Amino acid sequence: MPRTPKRVHQEAKEESAQADQPPKKSASEDVEAFTNKGFKNAIAATKAANAFPQGTARALYLSYPGYARVMEDLTQRVVALIGNVLHSKDIKGDIKKRQPEEQFEMVQECNDVLFERITTNLDIKGGLRRNTQQVVEAQVDVMSSSTSIEPAVASPQTQGTPKAGSWNRTTGTPQRSMVSARLFTAKNIVRPQTQFREPVDNSAQNPFVPRLKEKPNSLKPLALLPEYDDAGNVQSYLHPYEFELLKFQPPEEQFQKQKPVLPALMAETELMVVDTVEKLKQALEELRQAPQIAIDVEHHSYRTFMGITCLVQMSTRSKDYIFDTLILRDDMHILNLVLTDPKKLKILHGADLDIEWLQRDLSLYIVNMFDTHRAAKALNMARLSLAYLLKHYLDLDVDKSLQLADWRMRPLPQQLVDYARQDTHFLIYVYGRMTNDLLQQHAEPGLLGSVYQQSTDVCKKRYNKPHIGPESHLDLVRKTKRSFDNRQLYALRGIFEWRDATARSEDESYGYVLPNHMMLQIAESLPREMQGILACCNPIPPLVRQQLHTLHQIVLKARDQPLVKPILEAHSSTQAALPPSTKDFSSKLYCPHDFSQLEEIRDDLPTLLKRNSTTGKLEVPNKEEVAKVDPTLAAPAMALFEKQSKPTQEEEQRWAHLRKESQTMRMPYKRYLAILPLMVQLKADQLARERSELQKRQLCPAAPTVEQNIKLEAHAIGKEDDDMYSVPLKEQLKRKHPQANVKTDPEQQPTASKRPRKDENSQTKPPVKIEPVEKVQQALGESDDEVVEVPIERQATEPPKPSPAQNNRKQKKNQFQRGFKAKNRGNHPQSSSQQVPQHKGTGNFDYKNVDFRQFKGGAQRARGTEIKQQIRGKNRPNNRNNKQFNKLFTFSNVRKEGKK
């Protein structure tokens, strides 16, 4: 067995000893010296590793137990050291439990991380990351916020002094124009929110919690009191300075006339950029000496979900301050010592959003504020922007082309610094001028106090996180002129929820994740393939390309939905898009219904000028011709200011009759008599309609009338009656159809028809005689004292006398029926062609003498004949008969031969 070389064994021991010892710190900080030393160590380690036996020699050496044991110990130590390095570099996994291939992949991953970190550190050490960021500038055309008014030429006496603006200073018409806005940004800007000490919480479940730790200038101790919803969940928190704002009253000196002092030029004013804690404390001490402070905020909202406050500008009468809030985010709260002091006035312009941004990011609150935007609205100014106020009071044109700048750039370009300074540098002077204007409004003496009250209400605002509801996506549909079906709405809702979740998790805005117009395009087209989704986006957002599969699954689920609703409901119907307009509808001077400056001139009136047919020139006619021209128009049917024409004789008579009718009071009885003929006529018409309806509903034909029966021959009737009576009784009782015996009398034959017969003792009522209307009107024309009652006359008609032949027939019929009337009195046959016999000669029953007390139980309704089925057993002897009976009905037409 070959022995292990002593040199190799000693080198392995030295290498292991050096690995166990901690690395010595380099005395030189030079990058080149450190690199040379590292190369030497790497070369020595490579030589030592290459000195080990390889191939067949290594297999031969491993067969020796001592060599194999030493190599196993060294291998475990090296793997343990590599595992410690991987763990320190946040490489997940245990390298000791992996296979050799997996161990090699883990080492490669660690090398990549180390090389990237080394490259970054070398760039920082070499100063490559300290260079100024490359500024990208783009030009965009946007609508100007103010009117394009050319300044008038000032006189020598007024040059150099601020002039008050007026609506008639220039002859040009104020029109909004397109201005060029410059977009300032930089490439590869580091996201500031990644360097915050406290991570940003974008979740919708957790409400915004104020981060205020101490409460200076307080009347009530600091207490963050939550507000709960109906379900018992925390919805929001109360304002920390709500009690102080409720008790706040502006000092008396703020209601006195101010003495505005023109500020110095920005080039002559000191500027302090506060980006360290030491400078912040120094600025705080200087601000505590100033009675009035102008404040403005610069905000960024494109590459973050809730937004980031990037700059805060403050100005006093002698100095300007710019606070870098990205660096001093967690230390700016010490400025509450000044901002919450009720004795110091804070001046802002349009502070609705500034108040919320200061609360959310910097934990800053304001007490005693004057909002110049509210003051401009109280003064009914034509514009409410800060640029207009500077133009109005200072005749200063402010460049607003940098409103699209990216305020996250560090360091800030000088153009952005000057742009931020001008928002607060002149604001104190504007406050003084506006205060004097408000005090001069004698028509409304409390106007200044109302401005302070409105500004205090703005200070009470609290920040709330943005959230979406189940129908938030429908707001986008209502703003467009498109109509969506249920599939498209399903896709729109899914994409809308995906965008909200992605924006919160990635801390990006909705516009960066997926703009609204792209989202509507995807939901409307519902592309089948992934490339169709990308085709709807131009340019393609990075997060859309990254999560394309998720969006594709949402679209496919929407395509699988059944098409139920073709269009949107009426309450959520879309509105047509308004065409672009150059008019400023928010302007105080825009009065579309003010026509006082217009002259009412009609172009259809006759003219006195005539055109000569030969020369073609207009000529003035002579006076005689002018007199013939009648320029008056047709008289109106009704006029308010002109005297009406004299009415005609017919109109006077009609008006006199109407006045007499309105003045005459008629008695109620006369009114009754006047309406009586009309009511009788209406009742007769109703009876006629009912009679015609009954005739239409009659199923059986009507019986012949009495006159038709009288025309029959008497001898024929008598002979037929004798023949009928000679028939045996059994044949007479057989049922016959009423039309079988046409010659019989319907009055004497009870089974001939179902129509009931009239009572013989009852007489036909005479018809009502309607009095003519002329007679009633003559009676109404008399005086009210002489009431004349018009009686209703009835004409009595005699009943028709029966003929002798009819009397003989009745007598024979009555004599024939007396023989079996008593027998069949209680058992009348029920037939569809026979009537129930009725008794003659009985009059109406007299109920006057009836004692109804004996009928206490009341009457019961008669029940019909109940037919109960007999239930027979299976072994009954009559089952055979029942079967034959059923067979008889089933085969009733089959002749039975041979059976009796």
UniProtKB/Swiss-Prot annotation:
Protein origin, superkingdom: Eukaryota
InterPro entries for the chain: 3'-5'_exonuclease_dom (IPR002562), Exosome-assoc_fac_Rrp6_N (IPR012588), HRDC-like_sf (IPR010997), HRDC_dom (IPR002121), HRDC_dom_sf (IPR044876), RNaseH-like_sf (IPR012337), RNaseH_sf (IPR036397), Rrp6-like (IPR045092)
Tissue specificity annotation: Salivary gland (at protein level).
Residues covered by the HRDC domain: 485-565
Required co-factors: Mg(2+)
Subunit and partners: Component of the RNA exosome complex. Interacts with spn-A/Rad51; the interaction is required for the recruitment of spn-A to the DNA-damage response foci. Interacts with Su(var)3-9, a heterochromatin factor; the interaction promotes association of Rrp6 with a subset of genomic loci. Interacts with Su(var)205, a heterochromatin factor. Interacts with HDAC1, a heterochromatin factor.
Protein name (record): Exosome complex component 10 homolog
Organism: Drosophila melanogaster (Fruit fly)
